[in-house]
């Protein structure tokens, strides 16, 4: 059976390596390892049943429930009080006692899912092209059998087959229609893992979907690059990615140092591979894939024509005529020029420069990388430079950081986790309930995790490598990851300051003041000139540089734009800090908050909604916007924005009492009602209304929402896993594993706490 290993435990077994380094004892790291001797016959039979059940219902319920982790944690034998289920009949009203009973059931169960290091592990997945990238990187470097056991491969294949759509194709993500992106990459992955087309109906259907939709020549840009790397698509069929762009003067808006960090880091290694025109080993399997992905013989394909071809299922953001001119010029004139003397010397210099940056990124993220995409790319680049180098070998044990196992199989996470981000919210959720005394042990462990996950140092020579300040910040995941995130820093700061108000006898010693000052200094450094906050760094360039985005799949990826959610989280952290430490950088903080509030108000749409970029979508945006405005001193009476926001939310409440927003809201930028209540959407809307003072105006919508949440609560005390609510670039949807529990707990806790307070 498989076992989940946490923190220092994860340094052994499959993750064991003298090349595996950490800065804080692997805090937050979660690795699945296979133990052939583990488990009783009954436990193994239960795992098999859960897997069969998922496969049987996979087209009706695409989201896994993370049941294998829950099985393991249940076996640990945590003692739980015998709390009976809360049942509210249709003709009954919710009472304070009902809410409190529901809360206790939820928190008692949820506390048992906390890891010993203080965070809550879970399945942070949902994007279907990430595992193929990791498999491709292991294939071309010859390490597939070194890193992955037969059990790994079996579970990865299970996952890919489970998430094949009924039409035979695969989507870009678990949610949504089949695309050439998802289909080509997952088909090739199955082949590389040893699956054969002969007598394999699933592979045959996948191939049929690909061929009937234009073949792999109609794949989008990112897919074409990866297919080129493994040798089943020719590099001449790609839009040029010029390595020399990194050599232009830094002050120019088009220098990649000014791009959003994800695009900068991903295209950095893509540019290296393009400049090298690197192709992995041409094995018999690769030759088979060449035959199976196209309607005509591989040798007869017109690669230049294929360059601009993209299937309609993948063509989300067509190139403009200006972009067409740019890429034609780069492909026809610029790239060929750098392949002949004397300009090829500049290409060699450019490639060496890129490798210098790639090595720096790897070393300063403990070989985790910013994300699994640039990690997989960097790993290949390091192997090309020297297959025997530590720089390459250190990548291998960190692959496990991205693998997660559930009843639907083994999948790749979208990051190395969201440990810090979710733990900060969980702390705030538990504190909102007023039940701190009962769950002080849970809070104490979470407190320790957050305190010990702070980034303590700036990166050496960071400016030369385009990196922002990091000292005092928190990352999305672990300190080892190393990439500072403004909103994660803001929310964690807020959680820590809330805990500092509680007796140390209950939750442990407070964080040091110096650490708080470092956090505030770092937060203020993230502020744009207009007081707004972007996702990772300050906005560094103008929106017109989006003409350099060659991707048909993703929009607005060149610039790190400011966002309502990021801005709200950042200023809430600053506001919480000034309440306790009013004398530290007060003038700067006040100015920042003033400008940030203006930004949030100005981003409100005519119908009273706020667009949420990092979650689904308008309920998510409203929660952060209203919460941020309230923290800054606005209220329902003095803020038209808050009144309009509340009116918008109330207009979307379903007759049953909850809210249900479909993920397509993010794509079309209009609220799309899913028709059924979603626990997370309901909780976010409920919290926004609570913060605005809805309980004093008319508590009826809140009682209806609370009744809906309680009716959704499972027998275990948890809330159901429903449609994914994480979003990236308005086009990729994935799962935040703890949202399903933390937000309902927060909403019910805040409601109960305010009901009690209103009667005192």
UniProtKB/Swiss-Prot annotation:
It holds the Pfam family SQHop_cyclase_C. This is Achilleol B synthase. Specifically mediates the conversion of oxidosqualene ((3S)-2,3-epoxy-2,3-dihydrosqualene) to achilleol B. Achilleol B is probably formed by cleavage of the 8-14 and 9-10 bonds of (3S)-2,3-epoxy-2,3-dihydrosqualene as part of the cyclization reaction, after formation of the oleanane skeleton. It is found in: Membrane. GO terms for molecular function: intramolecular transferase activity. The keyword Transmembrane applies. GO terms for cellular component: lipid droplet; membrane. It comes from Oryza sativa subsp. japonica (Rice). It comes from the Eukaryota. The chain crosses the membrane at residues 612-632. PANTHER family: ACHILLEOL B SYNTHASE, TERPENE CYCLASE/MUTASE FAMILY MEMBER. One of its GO terms (biological process) is triterpenoid biosynthetic process. It catalyses: (S)-2,3-epoxysqualene = achilleol B.
């Amino acid at each position: 059976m498989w076992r989940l290993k946490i923190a220092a435990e994860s340094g052994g077994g499959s993750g064991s390596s003298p090349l595996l380094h950490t800065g804080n004892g692997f805090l937050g790291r979660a690795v699945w390892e296979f133990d052939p001797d583990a488990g009783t016959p009954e436990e193994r039979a239960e795992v098999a049943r859960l897997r069969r059940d998922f496969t049987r219902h996979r087209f009706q319920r695409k989201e896994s429930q993370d049941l294998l982790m829950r099985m393991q944690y249940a076996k640990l034998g945590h003692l739980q009080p015998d709390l009976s289920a809360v049942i509210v009949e249709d003709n009954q009203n919710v009472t304070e006692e009902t809410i409190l009973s529901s809360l206790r059931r939820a928190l008692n169960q949820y506390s048992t899912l906390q890891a010993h290091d203080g965070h809550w592990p879970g399945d942070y997945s949902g994007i279907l092209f990430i595992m193929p990238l990791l498999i491709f990187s292991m294939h071309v470097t010859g390490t597939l059998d070194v890193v992955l056991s037969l059990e790994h491969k079996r579970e990865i294949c299970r996952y890919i087959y489970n998430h094949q759509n009924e039409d035979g194709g695969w989507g870009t993500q678990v949610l949504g229609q089949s695309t050439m992106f998802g289909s080509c990459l997952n088909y090739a992955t199955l082949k590389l893992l040893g699956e054969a087309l002969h007598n394999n109906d699933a592979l045959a259907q996948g191939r049929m979907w690909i061929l009937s939709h234009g073949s792999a020549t109609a794949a989008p840009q990112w897919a074409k690059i990866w297919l080129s790397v493994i040798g089943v698509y020719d590099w001449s069929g790609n839009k040029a990615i010029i390595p020399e762009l990194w050599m232009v003067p830094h002050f120019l808006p088009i220098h990649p140092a000014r791009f959003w960090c994800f695009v900068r880091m991903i295209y950095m290694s893509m540019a290296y591979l393009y400049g090298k025109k690197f192709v992995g080993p041409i094995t018999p399997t690769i030759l088979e894939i060449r035959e199976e992905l196209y309607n005509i013989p591989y040798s007869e394909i017109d690669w230049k024509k294929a360059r601009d071809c993209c299937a309609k299922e993948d063509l989300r953001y067509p190139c403009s005529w200006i972009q067409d001119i740019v890429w034609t010029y780069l492909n026809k004139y610029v790239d060929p020029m750098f392949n002949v003397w004397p300009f090829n010397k500049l290409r060699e210099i450019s490639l060496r420069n890129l490798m210098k940056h790639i090595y720096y990124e790897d070393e300063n993220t403990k070989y985790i990388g910013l994300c699994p995409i640039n990690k997989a790319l960097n790993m290949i680049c390091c192997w090309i430079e020297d297959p025997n180098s530590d720089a390459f070998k250190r990548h291998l044990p960190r692959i496990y950081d991205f693998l997660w196992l559930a009843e639907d199989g083994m999948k790749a996470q979208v990051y190395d986790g969201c440990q810090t981000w979710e733990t900060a919210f969980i702390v705030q959720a538990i504190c909102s309930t007023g039940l701190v005394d009962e769950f002080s042990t849970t809070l104490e462990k979470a407190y320790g995790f957050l305190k010990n996950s702070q980034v303590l140092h700036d990166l050496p020579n960071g400016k030369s490598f385009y990196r922002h300040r990091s000292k005092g910040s928190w990352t999305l995941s672990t300190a080892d990851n190393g990439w500072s995130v403004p909103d994660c820093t803001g929310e964690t700061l807020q959680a820590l300051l809330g805990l500092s108000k509680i007796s140390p006898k209950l939750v442990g010693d407070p964080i040091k003041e110096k650490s708080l000052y470092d956090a505030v200094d770092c937060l203020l450094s993230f502020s744009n000139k207009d007081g707004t906050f972007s996702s990772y760094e300050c906005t560094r360039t103008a929106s017109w540089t989006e003409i350099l985005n060659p991707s048909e799949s993703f929009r607005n990826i060149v610039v790190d734009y400011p966002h309502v959610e990021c801005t709200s989280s950042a200023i809430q952290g600053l506001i919480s800090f000034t309440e306790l430490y009013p004398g530290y950088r007060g003038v700067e903080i006040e100015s920042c908050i003033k400008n940030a509030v203006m930004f949030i108000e100005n981003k409100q749409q005519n119908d009273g909604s706020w667009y949420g970029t990092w979650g689904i979508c308008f309920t998510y945006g409203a929660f952060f916007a209203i919460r941020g405005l309230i923290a800054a001193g606005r209220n329902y009476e003095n803020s038209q924005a808050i009144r309009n926001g509340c009116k918008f939310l109330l207009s979307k409440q379903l007759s049953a009492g909850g809210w249900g927003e479909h993920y397509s809201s993010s794509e079309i930028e209009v609220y799309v009602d899913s028709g059924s209540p979603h626990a997370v959407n309901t909780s976010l809307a409920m919290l926004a209304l609570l913060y605005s003072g809805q309980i004093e105006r008319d508590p009826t919508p809140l009682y209806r929402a609370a009744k809906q949440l309680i009716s959704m609560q499972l027998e275990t005390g948890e809330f159901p896993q429903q449609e994914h609510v994480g979003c990236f670039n308005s086009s990729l949807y994935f799962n935040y594993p703890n949202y399903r529990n933390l937000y309902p707990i927060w909403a019910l806790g805040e409601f109960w706490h305010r009901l009690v307070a209103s009667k005192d």
